[in-house]
Amino acid sequence: MARYDALELQVIDENGYEYIRAHEGVSIDDELLRFLRRTHTYELGWVKVEGDKYVRYDRIASVAIKRGLDDESGPGPSR
C-alpha cells in the first residue's frame, strides 16, 4: 500500500477537505512553499486539487501538510 504526503486544503463553505499531492521530485515542504508563494503551477487564481477539480485561491480558508495518506483509500472523509 503506497503512502504519500499532500497539502490539505479547507475550502470556505465546503464540508471536508481537498488535497494536493506534491509534484514529482518535490518534497511536500517545498510544495507548501510554492503554494504559499504562488509560484510554479500556483500562479493562477485557481488551484488544481486531486481528481479533476479546481478551487479558487480566495475560497481557501487554510492549508496544512498531511503526511502518510493511503493511496488505496485516499484522503478519506473529513477529519
Task: Name each region found by the language model.
Residues 42-79:
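Short, mixed-charge low-complexity intrinsically disordered segments
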Residues 11, 32, 36-40, 69, ...:
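Generic low-complexity, intrinsically disordered sequence content enriched
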Residues 2, 15-17, 40, 52-55:
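Intrinsically disordered, low-complexity segments enriched in small/polar residues
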Residues 22, 26-45, 49:
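Acidic, low-complexity, intrinsically disordered interaction modules
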